[in-house]
Every structure is written in structure tokens, then in C-alpha cells.
UniProtKB/Swiss-Prot annotation:
Any single biological process term in GO: response to hydrogen peroxide
Protein name: Hydroxylamine reductase
Binding-site list for hybrid [4Fe-2O-2S] cluster: 252, 276, 320, 408, 436, 461, 495, 497
Annotated [2Fe-2S] cluster binding sites: 3, 6, 18, 25
Enzymatic reactions: A + NH4(+) + H2O = hydroxylamine + AH2 + H(+)
A Pfam family: Prismane
Organism the protein comes from: Shewanella sp. (strain ANA-3)
Membership in a protein family: Belongs to the HCP family.
Physiological role: Catalyzes the reduction of hydroxylamine to form NH(3) and H(2)O.
């Protein structure tokens, strides 16, 4: 086992990364090894998908399968070995199908089929023990003693960034949005990563390419969400329980939320969002459901306590899931799509009857708690509509600064930095937030500036696209570069979606971003120095020191 993809990973003087029997996230060594093997199989599929594409052969099923299966290896998504094995076997079948199609296309074109790299020729074992014995060939640091540590760091930056992009591709696909050109570029990068490069310049360029690709993917996902559910609008949301039977929907998948709302209508069940599903409450399409009563709980790392106290059924539509046995609610939590946990019921298809029956069998909340409201829904359309008013307040001096503070949340005590930063931001500044990092301060009161709320909740982590659009619009209005705006980005990272959002921002030329609370363990000191020199990327320090720098206070 070697896994170094999230903030929780082990860091020691002898080296970084989870190994031995179990990772810090709870992932067993066998699961980690099987996930590495799955990635290796998917890279082989992408090799053939790329070669076949050159001859006009495109398999749409493969184009959607590879990102989806890749997503299953993201932090806190799938801990079920049998599900990972099934994905690997399916990858082998798709690769064989593409191989045959490629060779047939070569023959039809009168050309000789190329000899492809080992990753495209690997023969997957037929049993779990055999697959585990094959794991060393797919180990991400298998050649660490032969290469410079910076090369390994760059490879992992690319791999984890592409994994985040794959997650957004799958979110878009669920909403009916795919793009053959995006899929083709995705396969090219997967294939490239399947042949471990030692070219630092090529790897760095690839990292920026992944960022550019993800910008297009986020635009596609934004279109999927807004076309399906309308544009988010400023909305007041209750964060306290309401009396009645209950279902909690966590993750990111709004299509699943819609299905659950449709199937629970008239059944006396209240539905709550959790974590990154909170932004759904701002979409017009969901406001017709009176039994969508609010948001329960906070960010993913608190779920073992929050889910244990939730007297209903819980549905995990995507990341993040952690051990449900700790809070003894494994019999009433359900997984969907790429999510998996051993022994937890997995809902296949669009019938949520098993979830509904479980919710009806449970007590639900016995009384209404005193409401606590927050305001959400300041996504792209709402931000653009407010832009003229914002500009006027900037010009008259009422608004002097903007902070984008968001990203992933986590359980490190150092993350209090983000709470303290938001609370310490000057009263003439506006704070934009997104992702589950918002839970560090989104229930606090920040007031307004001439009617403009000082805290603007943009949405999910992928709604960084909305923030980018606002920054572009403001830079055009003020006729300046994005980096000349009175705007500072402070991003909290935990896993691979945050990595690809960061790569997207860097690829667009956004500079002087701060990330924290700790830098990714796979980034060497030398790589961190290069990123600081090239982009001004730096780690957070203290709120007082960082604010002085950001506000240009001597």
C-alpha cells in the first residue's frame, strides 16, 4: 500500500504517505492496492481509447465508464473491495473490446497496429488473491528509488488532479452532459500517466492542461445543473430539524435528490440536505417540494456524530463516506453510484423504496427545533445580476476588498484559521465561499454593506466556476487583470477535487493564492518553491500576518 492523496496521510521524517495495513482514512491496504490496480487498468483502457480515436473509433460507453470508475478511487468514496474488483473486470472487458475495434480499424485503413505499452497489455488476475499479488505493478511509487522525488510529486499532482476532474465529469454525466472532445483529451492524459514520465517540463505542462480541461468540465457541469434545475437564487435556509420522519441526502448528486423528493412526495417524510448538498436548496426546481425542509448538520468529517443522531435514513450520493459502524447507523445508511462501504446497502437504479421504507420505520424527529436560518444561492447568475451594485460600492469606497475563502473542510484543529480569517476580515470587505469549507463560518452573522450581504455562499466546490466568472466580469469592468483586483483567494484543501480546482485557477493565470492548513504531502519542498515563484502560491501562516499581506498593511 502507498497512498498520499489526501490531507490525512501520514507524514514522518522517514517519508510521507499511508502504507502498511491501513490508511488514515480507514482504507485497508488491500482496498488501496485494488484501487491502484483499477487505475492501472483504466490507464490501459485509455491507451486503446486514444489509439482507436485516431482512426475514428469512439465508444461513448468507455468515455463515461473510465471517469466514473476513476472517481471511485477518490478519497472517502468506495471502500468495498468487491465493487472495485468489479470495476477492474469491466475495465478489462472494455479494453479488449477497444483492442479489437482498434485492430479492425487498422486493418481497414491498411496500416499496422502499433505495439502498445505494458499498461495496455497487462492481464488482470481472475481472483482477489491473484489481483492483490499483482498490485506491485500498479504501485504509484514503484520506481521511487530510480527517479527524483520531484518527478514522483509531479506525477501524483497530475494523477490526483485528473482524478478530481473525473469526479466532475461523472457529476456532469449524471445530468446528461458529456463532451466527446473533453473525453478524448481525458483519455490522452490518462494514457500519458500510464507510461510513467521522467520529463518534469512535460509533467508540469500536463498539470496545467488538466486545469484547463477541468475549466471546460466545470462549465459543462454548470450548464447541466442550471438547465436541469434553473439558476440558483438567494434563498433563506433553515438548519434545524422539523418534526416528522426524515431522509438525509449527502454528497453532490442533485439528480438523486430530485428522484428522492419525487418518490417521497405525500408520504409524510421530510427531506434534508447535508454537506455539499446544501446548495440544492437554492435551485428553483427544488422549491416546489414543500417536504424539502432544510439542511441538517455540517461538513463530512462530523458525519459519524451527526448521522448517529439523525433519526432517519441517510443516502450517500457521492463522497464523502466514513465508517458508519462507529456511530452504529450502518443499517440505515445507503450508498449510490460510485460510493461503497462493505455491508452497507447499495441502491441500484432509480428506485429508492428501500430508503423510504427504512425512513418510515424509524422515529424521525419528535419536535420542531427553533429555526436557525442562513442565506445561500449566490452562484453565477445571482453574482452577475449583483455586479453593477457591487461595482458602484467598490467605486464609492464602501467595498474595499473581496476574499474567496472556501474549499474542503476537515478535522485538523489548524482549520480554525478559516473561521478566524472570516471573522477578522474588515467590515468593508465581502467574503465569498464555496465547498464544504464554508461550514467553518457559514452560520455566523456578517451583516451587509449597503444591502449586499458580506457573506456570499456561491455553492458546491465545482461552483468555483461561478467565482471565476465573477472575477472575469469585474476585471473587464475595471479594465484590469484578474490579479489586479482587490481579491484574495484562500483555499482549504483536503482531497483531489480541491487539487484540480487549484490547477484550474493556476492554468487561468490566477496568482497569489493561499492554501492550507497544510500543503499536500506529495508536493516536495522544491515543487512548492517553484509554484510559489511561478504563481505566488503559498501556504497559510497566521490570520494576522496573512491579512496584513493581503490588505497591503505595512
Amino acid at each position: 500500500m502507498f497512498c498520499i492523496q489526501c490531507e490525512q496521510t501520514i507524514r514522518t521524517p522517514a517519508g510521507n504517505g499511508c502504507s502498511y495495513a491501513q490508511g488514515m482514512c480507514g482504507k485497508l491496504a488491500a482496498t488501496s492496492d485494488l484501487q491502484d490496480l483499477l487505475i492501472y487498468m483504466l490507464q490501459g483502457v485509455s491507451v486503446y481509447a486514444t489509439k482507436a480515436r485516431e482512426l475514428g473509433v469512439i465508444n461513448p460507453e468507455v468515455d463515461t465508464f473510465v471517469p466514473k470508475a476513476f472517481f471511485s478511487t477518490l478519497t472517502n468514496v468506495n471502500f468495498d473491495d468487491e465493487r472495485i474488483i468489479a470495476y477492474a473486470k469491466q475495465a478489462a472487458e472494455y479494453r479488449e473490446s477497444l483492442k479489437n475495434a482498434y485492430e479492425a480499424a487498422c486493418e481497414a485503413a491498411g496500416k499496422r497496429a502499433e505495439s502498445l505499452p505494458p499498461v495496455a497489455q497487462f492481464v488482470l488476475g481472475t481472483s482477489k488473491p491473484e489481483m492483490l499479488s499483482q498490485a506491485p505493478v500498479a504501485l504509484l511509487n514503484k520506481d521511487k528509488n530510480e527517479i527524483h522525488e520531484d518527478i514522483l510529486g509531479l506525477r501524483l499532482l497530475c494523477l490526483y488532479g485528473l482524478k478530481g476532474a473525473a469526479a466532475y465529469m461523472e457529476h456532469a454525466r449524471v445530468l446528461g452532459k458529456t463532451d466527446a472532445e473533453i473525453a478524448g483529451r481525458f483519455h490522452e492524459i490518462m494514457a500519458f500517466l500510464g507510461e510513467p514520465s521522467v520529463d518534469a517540463d512535460k509533467l508540469f505542462t500536463t498539470a496545467m492542461d488538466i486545469g484547463q480541461l477541468n475549466y471546460r468540465i466545470m462549465a459543462m457541469l454548470d450548464a447541466g445543473e442550471t438547465e436541469a434545475f434553473g439558476h440558483p437564487e438567494p434563498t433563506v435556509v433553515n438548519t434545524k430539524p422539523v418534526k416528522g420522519k426524515a431522509i438525509l441526502v449527502s454528497g453532490h448528486d442533485m439528480k438523486d435528490l430530485e428522484l428522492i423528493l419525487e418518490q417521497t412526495a405525500g408520504k409524510g417524510i421530510n427531506v434534508y440536505t447535508h454537506g455539499e448538498m446544501l446548495p440544492a436548496l437554492a435551485y428553483p426546481a427544488f422549491k416546489k417540494y414543500a417536504h424539502l425542509v432544510g439542511n441538517y448538520g455540517s461538513a463530512w468529517q462530523n458525519q459519524q456524530k451527526e448521522f448517529a443522531n439523525f433519526p432517519g435514513a441517510v443516502v450517500m450520493t457521492s463522497n464523502c463516506i466514513i465508517d458508519p459502524n462507529v456511530g452504529q447507523y450502518s443499517d440505515r445508511i445507503f450508498t449510490r453510484s460510485i460510493v461503497g462501504w462493505p455491508g452497507v446497502t447499495h441502491v441500484i437504479g432509480d428506485d429508492f423504496s428501500v430508503v423510504i421504507d427504512k425512513a418510515l420505520s424509524l422515529d424521525g424527529f419528535q419536535y420542531d427545533e427553533i429555526p436557525h436560518n442562513i442565506t445561500i444561492g449566490f452562484a453565477r447568475n445571482a453574482l452577475m445580476a449583483a455586479a453593477p451594485t457591487v461595482v458602484e460600492n467598490v467605486k464609492n469606497g464602501s467595498i474595499k476588498h473581496f476574499f474567496l475563502v472556501g474549499g474542503c473542510d476537515g478535522d485538523k484543529s489548524e482549520r480554525s484559521y478559516f473561521t478566524d480569517l472570516a471573522k477578522s476580515a474588515p467590515k468593508d470587505s465581502v467574503i465569498l465561499t464555496l465547498g464544504c469549507g464554508k461550514y467553518k463560518f457559514n452560520k455566523l452573522e456578517f451583516g451587509d454593506i449597503n444591502g449586499i450581504p458580506r457573506l456570499l455562499d456561491i455553492g458546491q466546490c465545482n461552483d468555483a466556476y461561478s467565482a471565476i466568472q465573477l472575477a472575469i466580469a469585474l476585471s473587464q469592468i475595471f479594465e484590469c487583470d484578474i490579479n489586479e483586483l482587490p481579491l484574495n483567494l484562500v483555499l482549504s484543501w483536503f482531497e483531489q477535487k480541491a487539487i484540480v480546482v487549484l490547477l484550474t485557477l493556476l492554468s487561468l493565470g490566477v496568482k497569489n493564492i493561499r492554501t492550507g492548513p497544510t500543503p499536500p504531502a506529495f508536493l516536495t519542498a522544491n515543487l512548492a518553491k517553484i509554484l510559489e515563484e511561478k504563481f505566488g502560491l503559498r501556504n497559510t501562516t497566521t490570520v494576522e500576518a496573512d491579512l496584513k499581506t493581503m490588505l497591503n498593511v505595512a
